[in-house]
Amino acid sequence: MSFVVIIPARYASTRLPGKPLVDINGKPMIVHVLERARESGADRIIVATDHEDVARAVEAAGGEVCMTRADHQSGTERLAEVVEKCAFSDDTVIVNVQGDEPMIPATIIRQVADNLAQRQVGMATLAVPIHNAEEAFNPNAVKVVLDAEGYALYFSRATIPWDRDRFAEGLETVGDNFLRHLGIYGYRAGFIRRYVNWQPSPLEHIEMLEQLRVLWYGEKIHVAVAQEVPGTGVDTPEDLERVRAEMR
């Protein structure tokens, strides 16, 4: 099955300036992500960046780069610029792998591409079970609830579904109904072209979750449980030190 991986790698980061180029055990982080993507069997891998230093690091590792504007409001908008510059056909399957996920398993990159290819929807993503209350109540862990066919009903930073009886009793354990969304997406190129022409939705602004725009406009997102749980992503200096230790 043919698919393309696009890795958005924005240079500016409030909490970790120059994030794509931070060193992890002798390599820039973006090169680690590129290597994981290569292991997925993708037909083509493109790093989308707004900074020449990132481009040079990727090219030195034998990777392909697409230079993009620096003013994009989201990773999906950056993807859309690449889709147009590369003139991908509308049915091309594209997987968006975040540039700050150096420990992402190649298996789940392939999984999200396969899931999308098997369904007549524009978008697919993955989730993992939540087993502890700390994560269930953490607003930085995005929760998702699904219908009987595995399509997203809603994504939220709130604790959904709300387990009325268990939480009313003050229990610190959670049941088997909680899923944490992973920030990996598969799209068809034609869907990306439509997405960027939609106005942002009120729910998207409230939750600060751009995938809610898709549900707002009546489109479906398929969500599968990931075959492997990815390692730590890098958002903060503390995350970076943790990843360095785990990858040592």
UniProtKB/Swiss-Prot annotation:
Matching Gene3D superfamilies: Spore Coat Polysaccharide Biosynthesis Protein SpsA, Chain A
Pfam families: CTP_transf_3
Pathway given in the UniProt record: Nucleotide-sugar biosynthesis; CMP-3-deoxy-D-manno-octulosonate biosynthesis; CMP-3-deoxy-D-manno-octulosonate from 3-deoxy-D-manno-octulosonate and CTP: step 1/1; Bacterial outer membrane biogenesis; lipopolysaccharide biosynthesis
CDD domains per the UniProt record, alphabetical: CMP-KDO-Synthetase (cd02517)
Compartments, as annotated in UniProt: Cytoplasm
GO molecular function, one term: 3-deoxy-manno-octulosonate cytidylyltransferase activity
Keyword Cytoplasm in annotation: yes
A cellular component term, taken from the record's GO annotations: cytosol
EC identifiers of the protein: 2.7.7.38
Top-level EC class: transferase
Catalyzed reaction equations: 3-deoxy-alpha-D-manno-oct-2-ulosonate + CTP = CMP-3-deoxy-beta-D-manno-octulosonate + diphosphate
InterPro entries in the record: Cytidylyl_trans (IPR003329), KdsB (IPR004528), Nucleotide-diphossugar_trans (IPR029044)
GO process annotations (BP): CMP-keto-3-deoxy-D-manno-octulosonic acid biosynthetic process; lipopolysaccharide biosynthetic process
Record keywords: Cytoplasm, Lipopolysaccharide biosynthesis, Nucleotidyltransferase, Transferase
Functional note: Activates KDO (a required 8-carbon sugar) for incorporation into bacterial lipopolysaccharide in Gram-negative bacteria.
Family: Belongs to the KdsB family.
Name of the protein described by the UniProt record: 3-deoxy-manno-octulosonate cytidylyltransferase
Species per Swiss-Prot/TrEMBL record: Escherichia coli O139:H28 (strain E24377A / ETEC)
Taxonomic placement: Bacteria, Pseudomonadati, Pseudomonadota, Gammaproteobacteria, Enterobacterales
Gene giving rise to this polypeptide: kdsB
